[in-house]
């Protein structure tokens, strides 16, 4: 018994053999290849990242370009299964890789193809599915351990690619950077097919004798056949039934058979005159008999034994009898009674009779009893030097070699007589030979071989033409010289334009263009807007070295590719599920309405009642949020077993082998390459063909006369069997058909793709094309639709299959929880109360006379007007007046509203009862044209006129105001009455008109077409107030501060107020000079007044009448003029005037920048005295200091001492100035 150690050693070779077989089996059944990607060029002219920042830190402060440091560019690649909608998430199921840093902002690597630094190789060991999705990202490498790497640009591509040595070039021409790259899929050695899963390794040994063609099919070597090419092809004609062979051309017979082709049987041993049809038979020939067919049944006919004319008779098997003629005797009549009578001696021999018969004397050269044998004169050989002896009659002849001659070849022949030397100077005869003295360039025995002078002469793969005693090099393109040793400099002519740098290459050159230029010669000014990198309808503007995208309001980013979140930095008000309001300076209302983007990128939102919405989806999409891609493959449009891949409002058919066309409706003509040889006729089949062979030719392509099988007969590893007049293919798993050319689709049965994925067959493997929302090799991974988080206001996101749902916090609603539920929508507050919506609640603001949580408790009496009940405290508008219910009493403002405007083409429908639409007079049109504009008037009623005259003043309860307008800021069609009506509707009149009856009338100025005279009067005047002065001051203050949100007020350029003229006091100096006591009293009075004025702090500015101090009048200081900041200093600008000796008060527009300016204004209000100047002007003035530089004075520039305001007459005549 062997020890365990001994058994272990004996079992080790067996285990190694099993492991080797398993490895071989795995390699044969597997797949192997690689996906290759090469970066060709990169163009990032600004050195920017995708987020707009610079690769090298801050921008250049001069031109704001990223020129301080270039990007350290490298690339990352992710290869995954085919996706109709590319997603960045999910695993790189086919592989991933990256390059080292290969360049800066801009580089071109096309000239250095094959460099491993810019190449990424992703090996795979599965059947290549042909369809794929590729993600390529350009990154900036950061050496800083704190600052991570940043992405520059990324590109994605989905498509199909078959294994090939050819490269496929792709470009990324949108975004911050443009780059170009090429891809290909190659199978490893010994792997073939679209999936690199067909294994074929050439061999010539016991297991097979074959090579591999370009499709991986085994091509048998000459003399071999069979699926593994291990069956030798026997000698042509070798019986396939009774012969065989182990080596090509051999024919070894089976037992019992013989012959060159093993087609003859071996007869029974000893069979003499017999044949056989099967081995060991002895079938006698005619006239033969016996067990061994050795008995002659016709001896006379067979042997003719009787001589000299004797007659033969058969007497039995192998027996006969001769009847001899006269003079002959013997068994065969061979004895002649006269021996020489029959002339027995041949070749002219003489016969002599003897006692025993006869005797022959032969002539020279013959011998034998009857002189029939020729004497061999060549024995022994008489020819020398290898001459050949030919026997003659009574002699011989020597056939000598060329070097010898003579009867017995003993003489040396002169070979030079035959002139054997072709290209020689001379011929010299030698013993048994000769010598040719060759000319230069020739060699050989006869100087007929041209010496090859090309060996090692030509460089750089040039071809050499051999000459006589010389050579000539034919240079490839790009080289020159006798030996093609010199590279032609294609840059010598300076072909690059616009400062491009020429880089010399083999038979070509490359221009490295400066920034902003492109083309082979840098002749093209790069249009960075072609193709347009801007997305979502943005306008592209080309720059010298970059482009600029003017994004729509709803998008942002370098290429306007990102949806702008307006509510991120600006407070938004949710209107409904579809609309969000945000503050904007681009609209007159100051509000812009934007979409909530609830329907995503594939739909438009339509609001419904109750906060609901519907989505109007783009073509190809459906679902609540337009998130579902409509399955265009549902109708099965692909024919003949084609696989349908759904797209967006489209589909694509991946056809089965043998079919093509948009719907896989066209059978590929497999006869187009004329595969049939030797006159065979081709008939097209599905993914196959059939050759109808003629004239004895056989095989799939009529190429053989020996066998129906060859290397191309059965496809995809099928085994071919020759059945005489036809062949039969035994197909491996997954294939069927006459020549194993049809895939069974078994790899997709049952469907391995989950969640509605489409299975695409590739031989024995498959690929899943996933629906949107799913990813992974078998579509089993759900895409996270909640990333990034889409829900607002603390809403919870629930992820679904290509959808999500927001579960909102209390108080919020809508698809993304952006809508604050309006608890005021149900009007919970009592009539007249104001409901204030809050988060998950509301609050009621009660009007006067109401109380309670919902203002349901009433404390005042309601009013009844026009048949309606108005609650206590409620307000409403009545034409240009405002009314309010006060505990059962209606109180309204009392402003005369003037005639109502109307349109002539509408007739009297716009006018009250009893009035008609009368066209306005031409002088009443303030801003032309006023076509079709009228006023509602009654023929019985005369226009209301105020009691103001041209010399009316505040003391008369009247005001005359002149407005100067900038017509460029006013709309055409405005009438004088339109302007007057807007003045009547100013809010500043509401409180005043509640106590007094106010009349405002307007007339165009007869002297200037941009001025309107306004007369304001009041009734019911009491002694304790002057409403006209209050109204005038408020109008001037409103114009000065641009308050009121009115386009009319914004168009006012100047305001002048008529006031009472001042009287000159000629006796002012008399009391001043009378005594020092009077001067002291005036100073005390001025001091007291100044103290009171500071304490009051009224908003107006004050004026006083000019004193009669001639010294003060001599120093005339101009006041600041307030001008409209919108008014341009053009031809229509009203000049600043000094209205001397005129009863007017003028105000120009002054800007107010802040409350601080108002406080400063109050602190620095002063009074000034001017002789003979009752009109005052307040302006914004720029004064020049001594150095000539203009400076802006803050609002009020009058620095006059307040002590000058000591006159009582000045106090009485103080006016407000704005």
Swiss-Prot record:
InterPro entries: DSL, EGF-like_Ca-bd_dom, EGF-like_CS, EGF-like_dom, EGF-type_Asp/Asn_hydroxyl_site, EGF_Ca-bd_CS, Growth_fac_rcpt_cys_sf, JAG1_1/2_dom. Residues 1-33 form the signal peptide. This is Protein jagged-1. It comes from Homo sapiens. Glycans are attached at residues 143, 217, 382, 559, 745, 960, 991, 1045, 1064. Pfam families: DSL, EGF, EGF_DL_JAG, EGF_TEN, hEGF, JAG1, MNNL. Changing residue 184 to H: In ALGS1; loss of expression at the cell membrane. GO terms for molecular function: calcium ion binding; growth factor activity; molecular adaptor activity; Notch binding; phospholipid binding; structural molecule activity.
